[in-house]
């Protein structure tokens, strides 16, 4: 492998939506950085069977429903 072309690979802490934490190696951030997840396997409809609502960040879902809700597909 060529020297100096690969990103730094270090330990970070990942915080899940329910507050559980684990450490893993990543190229994201810097050594000791904390990654707070907004959606993970415990809150994403693909893994929960669609029983939970997605968060409406910035009103995007509301805006979409207001604009296209009356189509009645």
Swiss-Prot record:
Gene3D superfamilies: Ribosomal protein L31 (4.10.830.30). The gene is rpmE. Part of the 50S ribosomal subunit. This is Large ribosomal subunit protein bL31. One of its GO terms (biological process) is translation. Binds the 23S rRNA. SUPFAM superfamilies: L28p-like. One of its GO terms (molecular function) is structural constituent of ribosome. Keywords: Ribonucleoprotein, Ribosomal protein, RNA-binding, rRNA-binding. Pfam families: Ribosomal_L31 (PF01197). Belongs to the bacterial ribosomal protein bL31 family. Type A subfamily. It comes from the Bacteria. GO terms for cellular component: ribonucleoprotein complex; ribosome.
